[in-house]
Amino acid sequence: MNIENIRIAVIGLGYVGLPLLVEFGKHYPTLGFDLNQERIHSLKQQQDNTLELSSEELASAVKAEYSYTATDLNDCNVLIVTVPTPVDHHKRPLLEPLQEASRTIAPYLKADDIVIYESTVYPGASEEVCAPILEEISGLSASQKNDPGKNQCG
């Protein structure tokens, strides 16, 4: 993958995803994807109803676009999933948002695409829960290139 050909997608435009989108969108073509149509419409008007970012901060992302249409993910080759990972009353993570995001992006994956999960789940969740969904739906084979949570010091 060549840096000139990078097109980033940030899936989930909450308190983690939206600032990430803005920073990438200052330099690279970046698609902000969220299923909440009202959120997308307000962001297109440079209004963040959560008040995390100002209109000026949103406007600084000159290469950012917004969409709630999954087919727009087809043009992206770096996909960063930033959906919430709530916990149940026993403090166990609810993985449904990650699973649903994986099902949403999988049909649009191509060989050599990069998928990053920015999440607060237990170590191995991406590999154990999300990768099988991506592989089954996309027909591709996932490989874990880098796991910043693993201790590689000897």
Model regions: which residues?
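Rossmann-like NAD(P)(H) cofactor-binding subdomain of soluble oxidoreductases
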Residues: 87-154
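N-terminal Rossmann-like NAD(P) cofactor-binding module of classical short-chain dehydrogenase/reductase
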Residues: 79-80
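N-terminal glycine-rich dinucleotide-binding loop that anchors FAD/FMN and/or NAD(P) in oxidoreductases
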Residues: 47-66
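Short conserved AdoMet
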Residues: 25, 74, 109-110
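Short acidic low-complexity segments
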Residues: 1, 62-76
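Conserved NAD(P)H cofactor-binding loop of Rossmann-fold oxidoreductase domains
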Residues: 83-84
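Conserved beta-strand segments of alpha/beta enzyme cores
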Residues: 29, 63-65, 147
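NAD(P)+-binding Rossmann beta1-loop-alpha1 motif at the extreme N-terminus of oxidoreductases
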Residues: 1-47
